[in-house]
Each structure stands twice: as structure tokens, then as C-alpha cells.
């Protein structure tokens, strides 16, 4: 008897693609809900909706961002083809700003810049996860491919600027309340605002590195895509 072929649903490649599709779908639904909620609230309540943006969508934003840490595992085990370091930089800046800066300071949560930051982030993620979700099942559209590989070019630097402004606005509150700052037994202390100021400078260094990586990735994808269409 010859070797017995496994059913399609048991084949490793099928299971990997099915898992990635479900993951991308969950992320797409989460970010779409956030973006739609923010849009509807803005047109319904105007600027007043921007003040309590975090209270309305913060929990879902935190959930989506926490789940996105799985992407590091995807790259590490090889089920997602991408470079690990750029993704670490992207996720690190998001985690720090969302959880350590915005979530820890209620006064910062009411700033307009938080609403702007969330709009930029979710717009990028909606398009990115749509493209990834369709790509993993072999569906590709030239317009969507171009859009997903181009939208980040103006939006990503704006995201970083919004993150930097959020950190800058949070500094007086960290200085006043002493959040995360600790007095040590000897003549030294851990003063968190200093850490934020250093990180604020490093943020733009990371942006330069990530931007170059994304641009190289865009160039490679758009170069290969016309050849796929011809085949």
C-alpha cells in the first residue's frame, strides 16, 4: 500500500493558514469596531466625543494590542514571514504609549491627541489586517495591495508624532504623581519622567529604522505583485 494522503484540513499548511486567517479576522473586527465607534461618536457628539474616547474604546484597544504580541511568536516559529526586530520596535512603542502612558494617567486619557492617535493606528491596522487576511487565503487585489503598502507612508510618521506629543503631555502628570518612580534604599532613585524623556528621543530613531524597513518591504512587494498577476 502506498502512502495515504492526509485530508486537507489535517495538512500543516492548511492549519497554519486557517489559524492566521482567524487571527487576522479577529484583529480586523476589533480595529474596525474601534474605528467605526470613534467615527459614529464624532459625527454624533462632535469634539465632545474626543474627550472620552479612551473610556469608550480603551478596553477593546488594549485587548487588540495585547493579542498583537502573538505576532512576535508567529515570526519566531516561522508561521509568518517577517523580520522580528522591526516588529518588536513597532509593538514596543505601542505597548509603552498605550499601557504605561495613557492607561496609567486619567488626565492624559482626556487629551485630544489620544483620539487622533487611535484614529491613525486603527486606520492603518484595518487596512493591514484586511490585506493580510486575504493574502493568507490566496486572494489579492492590486488596489488593496498598493493601498496597504502606501497608506503607512504618511500615517506612520503622524502616529509617531502623536505618540511623542502624548508622552510630552504626560510628563507633568508623571512628575506630579510620581507614577512608576521609586525611591531606592541608597542615594539613588528611579525617576520615570527621565526614562520617558530618553525614550522620547529614541522614538524617532526607531521610526527611522522602521520606516526604512517598511519602505524596502513595500518596494519588494510591489515589484513582485505585477509578476504574480502575469502568471
Curated annotation (Swiss-Prot):
* Molecular functions per Gene Ontology: 3-hydroxyacyl-CoA dehydratase activity; enzyme binding; very-long-chain (3R)-3-hydroxyacyl-CoA dehydratase activity
Question: Per UniProt, what is the membrane topology?
Answer: Multi-pass membrane protein
Instruction: Say yes or no: keyword Transmembrane helix present.
Output: yes
Question: Which reaction(s) does the protein catalyse, per the Swiss-Prot or TrEMBL entry?
Answer: a very-long-chain (3R)-3-hydroxyacyl-CoA = a very-long-chain (2E)-enoyl-CoA + H2O; (3R)-hydroxyhexadecanoyl-CoA = (2E)-hexadecenoyl-CoA + H2O
Record-annotated membrane-spanning stretches: 20-40, 57-77, 113-133, 136-156, 158-178, 190-210
State where the protein is found.
Answer: Endoplasmic reticulum membrane
Pathway the protein contributes to = Lipid metabolism; fatty acid biosynthesis
Domain of life from the UniProt record: Eukaryota
Q: Which InterPro entries match?
A: Tyr_Pase-like_PTPLA (IPR007482)
Biological process (GO) annotations held by this record are:
fatty acid elongation; sphingolipid biosynthetic process; very long-chain fatty acid biosynthetic process
The terms describing its cellular component in GO are: endoplasmic reticulum; endoplasmic reticulum membrane
Catalytic site positions: 156, 163
Segments on the Cytoplasmic side according to the record's topology features? 1-19, 78-112, 157, 211-231
Keywords attached to this Swiss-Prot or TrEMBL record, sorted alphabetically, are:
Endoplasmic reticulum, Fatty acid biosynthesis, Fatty acid metabolism, Lipid biosynthesis, Lipid metabolism, Lyase, Membrane, Transmembrane, Transmembrane helix
Documented EC number(s)? 4.2.1.134
Described by its record, this protein's role is as follows: Catalyzes the third of the four reactions of the long-chain fatty acids elongation cycle. This endoplasmic reticulum-bound enzymatic process, allows the addition of two carbons to the chain of long- and very long-chain fatty acids/VLCFAs per cycle. This enzyme catalyzes the dehydration of the 3-hydroxyacyl-CoA intermediate into trans-2,3-enoyl-CoA, within each cycle of fatty acid elongation. Thereby, it participates in the production of VLCFAs of different chain lengths that are involved in multiple biological processes as precursors of membrane lipids and lipid mediators.
Assembly and partners? May interact with enzymes of the ELO family (including ELOVL1); with those enzymes that mediate condensation, the first of the four steps of the reaction cycle responsible for fatty acids elongation, may be part of a larger fatty acids elongase complex.
The family assignment reads: Belongs to the very long-chain fatty acids dehydratase HACD family.
Protein's UniProt name: Very-long-chain (3R)-3-hydroxyacyl-CoA dehydratase 4
Q: Which organism is it from?
A: Bos taurus
